[in-house]
Protein backbone atom coordinates (compact mmCIF):
# COMPACT_ATOMS: atom_id res chain seq x y z
CA UNK A 1 0.00 0.00 0.00
CA UNK A 2 1.25 3.51 -0.82
CA UNK A 3 1.86 6.37 1.55
CA UNK A 4 -1.09 7.17 3.76
CA UNK A 5 -2.59 10.59 3.11
CA UNK A 6 -3.96 12.64 5.99
CA UNK A 7 -7.23 12.96 4.05
CA UNK A 8 -7.74 9.21 4.61
CA UNK A 9 -8.19 9.70 8.36
CA UNK A 10 -9.35 13.33 8.47
CA UNK A 11 -12.79 14.84 8.52
CA UNK A 12 -12.76 18.41 7.20
CA UNK A 13 -15.33 21.19 7.47
CA UNK A 14 -15.88 24.39 5.57
CA UNK A 15 -16.15 27.69 7.54
CA UNK A 16 -19.94 27.57 7.20
CA UNK A 17 -20.12 23.98 8.45
CA UNK A 18 -17.68 24.76 11.27
CA UNK A 19 -20.12 27.42 12.49
CA UNK A 20 -22.85 24.76 12.76
CA UNK A 21 -20.86 22.72 15.31
CA UNK A 22 -21.36 23.38 18.99
CA UNK A 23 -18.38 23.65 21.43
CA UNK A 24 -18.56 19.99 22.44
CA UNK A 25 -18.49 18.81 18.82
CA UNK A 26 -15.58 21.15 17.99
CA UNK A 27 -13.69 19.83 21.00
CA UNK A 28 -14.24 16.25 19.83
CA UNK A 29 -13.03 17.21 16.33
CA UNK A 30 -9.81 18.75 17.71
CA UNK A 31 -9.08 15.77 19.97
CA UNK A 32 -9.55 13.25 17.16
CA UNK A 33 -7.48 15.22 14.62
CA UNK A 34 -4.58 15.77 17.03
CA UNK A 35 -4.53 12.19 18.29
CA UNK A 36 -4.62 10.76 14.78
CA UNK A 37 -1.83 13.12 13.75
CA UNK A 38 0.32 12.02 16.70
CA UNK A 39 -0.39 8.33 15.99
CA UNK A 40 0.63 8.71 12.36
CA UNK A 41 3.84 10.55 13.32
CA UNK A 42 4.71 7.89 15.91
CA UNK A 43 4.51 5.20 13.22
CA UNK A 44 7.05 7.03 11.09
CA UNK A 45 4.47 8.14 8.56
CA UNK A 46 5.58 11.77 8.77
CA UNK A 47 6.30 11.71 5.05
CA UNK A 48 2.64 11.24 4.13
CA UNK A 49 0.98 13.94 2.12
CA UNK A 50 0.26 16.41 4.95
CA UNK A 51 0.49 19.28 2.49
CA UNK A 52 -3.05 18.49 1.31
CA UNK A 53 -4.74 19.70 4.47
CA UNK A 54 -2.28 22.44 5.36
CA UNK A 55 -2.29 23.95 1.87
CA UNK A 56 -6.09 23.93 1.88
CA UNK A 57 -6.05 25.85 5.13
CA UNK A 58 -3.52 28.28 3.66
CA UNK A 59 -1.13 27.93 6.63
CA UNK A 60 2.02 25.96 7.48
CA UNK A 61 1.95 22.67 9.34
CA UNK A 62 3.30 23.91 12.66
CA UNK A 63 0.80 26.80 12.73
CA UNK A 64 -2.20 24.48 12.38
CA UNK A 65 -0.99 22.01 15.02
CA UNK A 66 -0.23 24.86 17.42
CA UNK A 67 -3.65 26.32 16.66
CA UNK A 68 -5.45 23.05 17.46
CA UNK A 69 -3.37 22.33 20.56
CA UNK A 70 -4.11 25.85 21.86
CA UNK A 71 -7.83 25.10 21.27
CA UNK A 72 -8.18 28.12 18.99
CA UNK A 73 -10.68 28.35 16.16
CA UNK A 74 -8.87 27.11 13.00
CA UNK A 75 -11.15 29.17 10.76
CA UNK A 76 -10.26 32.43 12.52
CA UNK A 77 -6.72 32.24 11.09
CA UNK A 78 -6.11 33.91 7.72
CA UNK A 79 -9.84 34.22 6.94
CA UNK A 80 -9.36 35.94 3.59
CA UNK A 81 -7.34 33.07 2.14
CA UNK A 82 -9.42 30.29 3.63
CA UNK A 83 -12.57 31.82 2.21
CA UNK A 84 -11.31 30.88 -1.24
CA UNK A 85 -10.78 27.24 -0.28
CA UNK A 86 -13.65 25.02 0.84
CA UNK A 87 -11.83 22.28 2.72
CA UNK A 88 -14.85 20.02 2.47
CA UNK A 89 -13.86 18.82 -1.00
CA UNK A 90 -14.86 15.90 -3.17
CA UNK A 91 -13.16 13.54 -0.72
CA UNK A 92 -16.23 13.71 1.50
CA UNK A 93 -18.64 13.26 -1.39
CA UNK A 94 -16.91 9.97 -2.20
CA UNK A 95 -18.12 8.64 1.14
CA UNK A 96 -21.35 10.57 1.76
CA UNK A 97 -24.45 10.83 -0.39
CA UNK A 98 -25.20 14.46 -1.37
CA UNK A 99 -28.59 14.48 0.35
CA UNK A 100 -27.07 13.35 3.63
CA UNK A 101 -24.80 16.40 4.00
CA UNK A 102 -23.82 17.04 7.57
CA UNK A 103 -26.31 14.43 8.81
CA UNK A 104 -23.48 11.89 8.95
CA UNK A 105 -21.71 11.65 12.27
CA UNK A 106 -17.95 11.98 12.83
CA UNK A 107 -17.77 8.34 13.76
CA UNK A 108 -19.37 6.86 10.64
CA UNK A 109 -17.08 8.74 8.25
CA UNK A 110 -13.94 7.91 10.18
CA UNK A 111 -14.72 4.23 10.57
CA UNK A 112 -15.32 3.91 6.83
CA UNK A 113 -11.95 5.46 6.08
CA UNK A 114 -10.09 3.39 8.66
CA UNK A 115 -11.61 0.18 7.24
CA UNK A 116 -10.67 1.24 3.69
CA UNK A 117 -7.06 1.88 4.68
CA UNK A 118 -6.76 -1.54 6.48
CA UNK A 119 -4.74 0.06 9.29
CA UNK A 120 -4.36 -3.00 11.52
CA UNK A 121 -1.27 -1.69 13.34
CA UNK A 122 -2.51 1.85 13.72
CA UNK A 123 -4.32 2.31 17.03
CA UNK A 124 -6.83 5.01 16.24
CA UNK A 125 -9.55 6.11 18.63
CA UNK A 126 -12.85 4.27 18.44
CA UNK A 127 -15.00 7.36 18.53
CA UNK A 128 -18.13 5.37 17.77
CA UNK A 129 -18.12 4.10 21.39
CA UNK A 130 -16.88 7.40 22.83
CA UNK A 131 -19.68 9.43 21.33
CA UNK A 132 -22.17 6.69 22.16
CA UNK A 133 -21.31 7.25 25.84
CA UNK A 134 -21.25 11.02 25.36
CA UNK A 135 -24.68 10.90 23.74
CA UNK A 136 -26.10 9.10 26.76
CA UNK A 137 -24.69 11.76 29.11
CA UNK A 138 -25.65 14.76 26.98
CA UNK A 139 -29.36 14.48 26.24
CA UNK A 140 -29.35 17.46 23.91
CA UNK A 141 -26.71 15.98 21.58
CA UNK A 142 -27.94 14.38 18.37
CA UNK A 143 -25.23 12.45 16.52
CA UNK A 144 -27.21 12.50 13.28
CA UNK A 145 -27.75 16.24 13.23
CA UNK A 146 -24.51 18.18 13.65
CA UNK A 147 -26.23 21.47 12.86
CA UNK A 148 -28.65 21.13 15.80
CA UNK A 149 -27.91 23.60 18.56
CA UNK A 150 -27.19 21.83 21.84
CA UNK A 151 -27.06 24.97 23.93
CA UNK A 152 -30.00 27.10 24.99
CA UNK A 153 -28.66 30.27 23.30
CA UNK A 154 -31.01 31.96 20.85
CA UNK A 155 -28.77 33.83 18.42
CA UNK A 156 -31.31 34.27 15.61
CA UNK A 157 -34.01 36.89 16.15
CA UNK A 158 -37.10 37.55 14.06
CA UNK A 159 -37.44 41.25 13.20
CA UNK A 160 -41.24 40.91 13.04
CA UNK A 161 -42.14 39.42 16.43
CA UNK A 162 -38.73 39.74 18.19
CA UNK A 163 -38.78 36.03 19.02
CA UNK A 164 -35.38 34.37 19.46
CA UNK A 165 -34.36 31.03 17.96
CA UNK A 166 -31.42 28.70 18.48
CA UNK A 167 -31.65 27.46 14.86
CA UNK A 168 -31.60 29.53 11.67
CA UNK A 169 -34.12 27.11 10.10
CA UNK A 170 -36.64 27.91 12.83
CA UNK A 171 -36.14 31.63 12.21
CA UNK A 172 -37.01 31.10 8.54
CA UNK A 173 -40.17 29.21 9.53
CA UNK A 174 -41.17 32.09 11.80
CA UNK A 175 -40.67 34.67 9.04
CA UNK A 176 -42.81 32.66 6.62
CA UNK A 177 -45.59 32.42 9.21
CA UNK A 178 -45.78 36.25 9.38
CA UNK A 179 -46.44 36.54 5.65
CA UNK A 180 -49.55 34.36 5.97
CA UNK A 181 -48.64 32.56 2.77
CA UNK A 182 -49.34 28.84 2.48
CA UNK A 183 -47.96 27.94 -0.94
CA UNK A 184 -47.70 24.19 -0.36
CA UNK A 185 -50.89 22.21 -0.98
CA UNK A 186 -51.51 18.50 -0.48
CA UNK A 187 -52.90 16.93 -3.66
CA UNK A 188 -54.68 14.20 -1.70
CA UNK A 189 -56.68 16.12 0.92
CA UNK A 190 -56.27 19.76 -0.10
CA UNK A 191 -54.61 20.88 3.15
CA UNK A 192 -52.26 23.86 2.78
CA UNK A 193 -49.15 24.81 4.74
CA UNK A 194 -46.42 27.43 4.79
CA UNK A 195 -43.72 24.73 5.04
CA UNK A 196 -42.84 22.15 2.43
CA UNK A 197 -41.64 19.74 5.15
CA UNK A 198 -45.14 19.50 6.62
CA UNK A 199 -46.59 18.78 3.17
CA UNK A 200 -43.98 16.08 2.61
CA UNK A 201 -44.96 14.47 5.92
CA UNK A 202 -48.65 14.84 5.03
CA UNK A 203 -48.18 13.07 1.70
CA UNK A 204 -46.32 10.23 3.40
CA UNK A 205 -49.38 9.62 5.58
CA UNK A 206 -51.58 9.25 2.47
CA UNK A 207 -49.27 6.89 0.59
CA UNK A 208 -48.19 5.01 3.73
CA UNK A 209 -44.49 5.74 3.24
CA UNK A 210 -42.29 5.35 6.34
CA UNK A 211 -38.70 6.12 5.24
CA UNK A 212 -37.19 6.38 8.74
CA UNK A 213 -36.62 2.88 10.11
CA UNK A 214 -35.13 2.16 13.51
CA UNK A 215 -32.40 -0.47 13.36
CA UNK A 216 -32.96 -1.35 17.01
CA UNK A 217 -36.62 -2.32 17.01
CA UNK A 218 -37.51 -2.31 13.31
CA UNK A 219 -40.22 0.33 13.70
CA UNK A 220 -40.68 2.70 10.74
CA UNK A 221 -41.77 6.34 10.86
CA UNK A 222 -42.84 9.01 8.39
CA UNK A 223 -41.28 11.82 10.44
CA UNK A 224 -37.64 12.24 11.40
CA UNK A 225 -38.63 13.61 14.84
CA UNK A 226 -40.55 10.41 15.68
CA UNK A 227 -37.54 8.38 14.54
CA UNK A 228 -35.31 10.48 16.84
CA UNK A 229 -37.69 9.91 19.76
CA UNK A 230 -37.53 6.16 19.13
CA UNK A 231 -33.73 6.25 19.27
CA UNK A 232 -33.86 8.13 22.56
CA UNK A 233 -35.90 5.29 24.03
CA UNK A 234 -33.16 2.82 23.11
CA UNK A 235 -30.24 4.87 24.46
CA UNK A 236 -32.11 5.76 27.67
CA UNK A 237 -31.69 4.04 31.00
CA UNK A 238 -34.87 2.01 30.54
CA UNK A 239 -34.90 1.62 26.78
CA UNK A 240 -35.98 -2.03 26.64
CA UNK A 241 -38.06 -2.73 29.74
CA UNK A 242 -40.47 -5.64 30.06
CA UNK A 243 -43.81 -4.50 31.46
CA UNK A 244 -44.52 -7.96 32.83
CA UNK A 245 -41.41 -8.66 34.93
CA UNK A 246 -39.80 -5.14 34.95
CA UNK A 247 -36.48 -6.56 33.74
CA UNK A 248 -34.34 -4.29 31.51
CA UNK A 249 -32.59 -5.63 28.39
CA UNK A 250 -29.80 -4.24 26.23
CA UNK A 251 -31.51 -5.16 22.98
CA UNK A 252 -35.12 -5.20 21.82
CA UNK A 253 -34.60 -8.68 20.36
CA UNK A 254 -33.87 -10.05 23.85
CA UNK A 255 -36.95 -8.27 25.14
CA UNK A 256 -39.03 -9.79 22.32
CA UNK A 257 -37.94 -13.32 23.35
CA UNK A 258 -38.87 -12.68 26.99
CA UNK A 259 -42.22 -11.13 26.05
CA UNK A 260 -42.97 -14.19 23.92
CA UNK A 261 -42.35 -16.42 26.94
CA UNK A 262 -44.74 -14.30 28.98
CA UNK A 263 -47.39 -14.51 26.26
CA UNK A 264 -47.17 -18.30 26.11
CA UNK A 265 -47.78 -18.46 29.87
CA UNK A 266 -50.90 -16.26 29.65
CA UNK A 267 -53.81 -18.64 30.00
CA UNK A 268 -56.49 -16.14 31.08
CA UNK A 269 -57.95 -14.41 28.03
CA UNK A 270 -60.48 -11.57 27.92
CA UNK A 271 -63.52 -12.55 25.83
CA UNK A 272 -64.25 -8.90 25.07
CA UNK A 273 -60.97 -7.79 23.43
CA UNK A 274 -58.83 -10.96 23.29
CA UNK A 275 -56.07 -9.66 25.58
CA UNK A 276 -54.37 -12.44 27.61
CA UNK A 277 -53.03 -12.46 31.18
CA UNK A 278 -51.02 -14.88 33.31
CA UNK A 279 -53.09 -14.30 36.47
CA UNK A 280 -56.84 -14.55 36.97
CA UNK A 281 -56.81 -11.53 39.30
CA UNK A 282 -55.23 -9.37 36.59
CA UNK A 283 -57.92 -10.47 34.13
CA UNK A 284 -60.61 -9.57 36.69
CA UNK A 285 -59.15 -6.06 37.02
CA UNK A 286 -58.93 -5.73 33.24
CA UNK A 287 -62.61 -6.62 32.75
CA UNK A 288 -63.57 -3.52 34.73
CA UNK A 289 -62.43 -1.44 31.75
CA UNK A 290 -65.21 -2.96 29.64
CA UNK A 291 -67.90 -3.06 32.35
CA UNK A 292 -67.16 0.44 33.66
CA UNK A 293 -67.18 -0.90 37.22
CA UNK A 294 -65.43 1.33 39.77
CA UNK A 295 -65.42 -0.53 43.10
CA UNK A 296 -62.82 1.60 44.89
CA UNK A 297 -64.50 4.65 46.43
CA UNK A 298 -62.90 7.64 48.16
CA UNK A 299 -64.37 8.16 51.65
CA UNK A 300 -63.58 11.88 51.52
CA UNK A 301 -65.33 13.00 48.33
CA UNK A 302 -67.10 9.86 47.06
CA UNK A 303 -65.16 9.65 43.79
CA UNK A 304 -64.80 6.07 42.48
CA UNK A 305 -61.97 4.30 40.66
CA UNK A 306 -61.62 1.02 38.82
CA UNK A 307 -58.18 0.21 40.28
CA UNK A 308 -56.91 0.52 43.85
CA UNK A 309 -53.62 2.29 42.89
CA UNK A 310 -55.70 5.06 41.29
CA UNK A 311 -57.57 5.52 44.58
CA UNK A 312 -54.25 5.64 46.47
CA UNK A 313 -53.00 8.39 44.16
CA UNK A 314 -56.27 10.29 44.51
CA UNK A 315 -56.18 10.22 48.33
CA UNK A 316 -53.00 12.31 48.22
CA UNK A 317 -55.11 15.24 47.02
CA UNK A 318 -56.94 15.25 50.36
CA UNK A 319 -53.97 14.36 52.54
CA UNK A 320 -51.65 16.75 50.63
CA UNK A 321 -49.06 13.96 50.73
CA UNK A 322 -46.28 14.46 48.19
CA UNK A 323 -43.75 11.63 48.47
CA UNK A 324 -41.78 12.37 45.28
CA UNK A 325 -39.12 15.06 45.72
CA UNK A 326 -36.96 16.77 43.11
CA UNK A 327 -33.27 16.49 44.06
CA UNK A 328 -32.48 19.61 42.05
CA UNK A 329 -34.79 22.21 43.65
CA UNK A 330 -36.57 20.35 46.46
CA UNK A 331 -40.06 20.65 44.98
CA UNK A 332 -42.37 17.76 45.91
CA UNK A 333 -45.09 15.96 43.94
CA UNK A 334 -47.86 13.50 44.66
CA UNK A 335 -47.23 11.42 41.52
CA UNK A 336 -43.99 10.07 40.05
CA UNK A 337 -45.13 11.09 36.56
CA UNK A 338 -45.39 14.73 37.74
CA UNK A 339 -41.82 14.58 39.05
CA UNK A 340 -40.61 13.13 35.73
CA UNK A 341 -42.27 15.99 33.85
CA UNK A 342 -40.87 18.55 36.30
CA UNK A 343 -37.29 17.32 35.88
CA UNK A 344 -37.41 18.41 32.24
CA UNK A 345 -37.49 22.02 33.45
CA UNK A 346 -33.97 21.56 34.85
CA UNK A 347 -32.62 19.53 31.93
CA UNK A 348 -34.20 21.84 29.33
CA UNK A 349 -35.43 18.81 27.41
CA UNK A 350 -38.33 19.62 25.06
CA UNK A 351 -39.09 16.53 23.02
CA UNK A 352 -42.63 17.41 21.94
CA UNK A 353 -42.57 19.76 18.93
CA UNK A 354 -45.44 21.50 17.12
CA UNK A 355 -45.38 20.76 13.37
CA UNK A 356 -47.22 24.01 12.65
CA UNK A 357 -44.90 26.62 14.22
CA UNK A 358 -41.92 24.61 15.49
CA UNK A 359 -42.47 25.46 19.17
CA UNK A 360 -41.29 22.71 21.54
CA UNK A 361 -42.66 21.54 24.89
CA UNK A 362 -41.47 19.28 27.71
CA UNK A 363 -44.89 17.62 28.12
CA UNK A 364 -47.11 16.02 25.49
CA UNK A 365 -50.20 17.48 27.19
CA UNK A 366 -48.79 21.00 26.72
CA UNK A 367 -48.30 20.30 23.01
CA UNK A 368 -51.89 19.03 22.75
CA UNK A 369 -53.14 22.23 24.39
CA UNK A 370 -50.88 24.40 22.20
CA UNK A 371 -52.16 22.79 18.98
CA UNK A 372 -55.63 24.09 19.83
CA UNK A 373 -54.29 27.62 19.31
CA UNK A 374 -53.78 26.75 15.62
CA UNK A 375 -57.00 24.76 15.23
CA UNK A 376 -59.14 27.03 17.41
CA UNK A 377 -60.62 23.95 19.07
CA UNK A 378 -62.31 24.46 22.46
CA UNK A 379 -63.76 21.07 23.41
CA UNK A 380 -64.67 21.83 27.03
CA UNK A 381 -67.95 23.76 27.30
CA UNK A 382 -69.66 25.22 30.37
CA UNK A 383 -73.25 23.99 30.71
CA UNK A 384 -74.22 27.13 32.65
CA UNK A 385 -73.20 29.91 30.24
CA UNK A 386 -71.97 28.03 27.15
CA UNK A 387 -68.41 29.38 27.37
CA UNK A 388 -65.85 27.00 25.85
CA UNK A 389 -62.25 26.31 26.88
CA UNK A 390 -59.18 24.67 25.39
CA UNK A 391 -58.34 22.77 28.57
CA UNK A 392 -60.52 20.86 31.05
CA UNK A 393 -58.79 22.46 34.06
CA UNK A 394 -59.82 25.90 32.77
CA UNK A 395 -63.44 24.72 32.67
CA UNK A 396 -63.23 23.42 36.27
CA UNK A 397 -61.83 26.77 37.37
CA UNK A 398 -64.50 28.67 35.43
CA UNK A 399 -67.35 26.65 36.99
CA UNK A 400 -66.37 28.00 40.40
CA UNK A 401 -67.50 31.44 39.19
CA UNK A 402 -71.05 30.08 38.96
CA UNK A 403 -70.94 27.97 42.12
CA UNK A 404 -69.02 30.55 44.16
CA UNK A 405 -66.77 27.79 45.45
CA UNK A 406 -63.46 29.03 46.87
CA UNK A 407 -61.74 26.07 48.52
CA UNK A 408 -58.29 27.63 49.00
CA UNK A 409 -58.10 29.98 52.00
CA UNK A 410 -55.26 32.27 53.09
CA UNK A 411 -54.21 31.67 56.71
CA UNK A 412 -52.95 35.26 57.04
CA UNK A 413 -56.05 37.27 56.10
CA UNK A 414 -58.74 34.65 55.53
CA UNK A 415 -59.26 35.50 51.86
CA UNK A 416 -60.42 32.53 49.78
CA UNK A 417 -59.63 31.62 46.17
CA UNK A 418 -61.04 29.38 43.47
CA UNK A 419 -57.65 27.92 42.59
CA UNK A 420 -54.58 26.92 44.61
CA UNK A 421 -52.23 28.81 42.28
CA UNK A 422 -54.15 32.03 43.04
CA UNK A 423 -53.60 31.43 46.76
CA UNK A 424 -49.86 30.91 46.15
CA UNK A 425 -49.75 34.16 44.20
CA UNK A 426 -51.77 35.98 46.88
CA UNK A 427 -49.40 34.88 49.67
CA UNK A 428 -46.63 36.87 47.98
CA UNK A 429 -48.57 40.05 48.85
CA UNK A 430 -47.96 39.28 52.54
CA UNK A 431 -44.34 38.18 52.06
CA UNK A 432 -43.54 40.93 49.51
CA UNK A 433 -41.80 38.38 47.32
CA UNK A 434 -41.47 39.32 43.63
CA UNK A 435 -39.23 36.67 42.05
CA UNK A 436 -39.91 37.46 38.38
CA UNK A 437 -37.94 40.46 37.08
CA UNK A 438 -38.09 42.17 33.67
CA UNK A 439 -34.66 42.39 31.97
CA UNK A 440 -35.74 45.46 30.00
CA UNK A 441 -36.89 47.87 32.73
CA UNK A 442 -36.16 46.02 35.98
CA UNK A 443 -39.78 45.85 37.10
CA UNK A 444 -40.50 42.82 39.31
CA UNK A 445 -43.62 40.68 39.58
CA UNK A 446 -44.94 38.08 42.00
CA UNK A 447 -46.24 35.83 39.21
CA UNK A 448 -44.53 34.61 36.03
CA UNK A 449 -47.62 35.17 33.86
CA UNK A 450 -47.60 38.85 34.87
CA UNK A 451 -44.00 39.13 33.67
CA UNK A 452 -44.92 37.43 30.37
CA UNK A 453 -47.79 39.87 29.84
CA UNK A 454 -45.58 42.82 30.84
CA UNK A 455 -42.86 41.89 28.32
CA UNK A 456 -45.37 42.37 25.51
CA UNK A 457 -45.40 46.10 26.34
CA UNK A 458 -41.74 46.24 25.25
CA UNK A 459 -42.10 43.92 22.26
CA UNK A 460 -45.47 45.27 21.11
CA UNK A 461 -46.69 41.72 20.59
CA UNK A 462 -50.50 41.29 20.54
CA UNK A 463 -51.20 37.60 19.91
CA UNK A 464 -54.88 37.58 20.91
CA UNK A 465 -57.11 38.77 18.07
CA UNK A 466 -60.87 39.30 18.07
CA UNK A 467 -62.56 37.33 15.28
CA UNK A 468 -65.45 39.80 15.17
CA UNK A 469 -63.68 43.13 14.61
CA UNK A 470 -60.01 42.17 14.21
CA UNK A 471 -58.81 44.12 17.26
CA UNK A 472 -55.71 42.57 18.88
CA UNK A 473 -54.69 42.38 22.53
CA UNK A 474 -51.56 41.55 24.49
CA UNK A 475 -53.45 39.51 27.09
CA UNK A 476 -56.11 36.84 26.69
CA UNK A 477 -58.12 38.32 29.58
CA UNK A 478 -58.36 41.63 27.71
CA UNK A 479 -59.69 39.79 24.66
CA UNK A 480 -62.26 37.95 26.81
CA UNK A 481 -63.48 41.24 28.26
CA UNK A 482 -63.60 42.79 24.80
CA UNK A 483 -65.71 39.94 23.40
CA UNK A 484 -68.52 40.74 25.83
CA UNK A 485 -69.07 43.95 23.83
CA UNK A 486 -70.08 41.84 20.81
CA UNK A 487 -71.98 39.15 22.72
CA UNK A 488 -73.51 41.62 25.24
CA UNK A 489 -72.91 38.91 27.81
CA UNK A 490 -73.08 40.03 31.46
CA UNK A 491 -71.99 37.05 33.55
CA UNK A 492 -71.25 39.00 36.75
CA UNK A 493 -74.46 39.49 38.74
CA UNK A 494 -75.00 41.45 41.96
CA UNK A 495 -76.57 39.27 44.65
CA UNK A 496 -78.13 42.31 46.35
CA UNK A 497 -80.10 43.90 43.51
CA UNK A 498 -79.68 41.48 40.61
CA UNK A 499 -77.92 43.97 38.33
CA UNK A 500 -75.52 42.29 35.87
CA UNK A 501 -72.17 43.43 34.48
CA UNK A 502 -69.84 42.18 31.76
CA UNK A 503 -66.68 42.76 33.84
CA UNK A 504 -65.91 41.58 37.37
CA UNK A 505 -64.25 44.94 38.09
CA UNK A 506 -67.51 46.73 37.31
CA UNK A 507 -69.37 44.42 39.69
CA UNK A 508 -66.82 45.10 42.44
CA UNK A 509 -67.30 48.88 42.06
CA UNK A 510 -71.09 48.46 42.08
CA UNK A 511 -71.12 46.29 45.21
CA UNK A 512 -69.50 49.13 47.16
CA UNK A 513 -72.66 51.21 46.64
CA UNK A 514 -74.59 48.73 48.80
CA UNK A 515 -72.04 48.84 51.62
From Swiss-Prot:
Keyword entries, A-Z: Metal-binding, Nucleus, Repeat, Zinc, Zinc-finger
InterPro entries cross-referenced by the UniProt entry: KRAB, KRAB_dom_sf, Znf_C2H2-type, Znf_C2H2_sf, Znf_C2H2_type
Localization per record: Nucleus
Annotated signal peptide: none
GO molecular function, one term: DNA-binding transcription factor activity, RNA polymerase II-specific
Record CDD domains: KRAB_A-box (cd07765)
Keyword Protease: no
Keyword Transferase (UniProt): no
Any coiled-coil regions, as ranges: none
Zinc finger (C2H2-type): 156-178, 184-206, 212-234, 240-262, 268-290, 296-318, 324-346, 352-374, 380-402, 408-430, 436-458, 464-486, 492-514
Gene Ontology BP annotations: regulation of DNA-templated transcription
Primary location group: nucleus
Residue intervals of the KRAB domain: 4-87
SMART domains for the chain: KRAB (SM00349), ZnF_C2H2 (SM00355)
Disulfide bond sites: none
Pfam entry (one): KRAB
GO cellular component: nucleus
PANTHER family: C2H2-TYPE DOMAIN-CONTAINING PROTEIN, ZNF44 PROTEIN
Described function: May be involved in transcriptional regulation.
Entry protein name: Zinc finger protein 695
The organism of origin for this protein: Homo sapiens (Human)
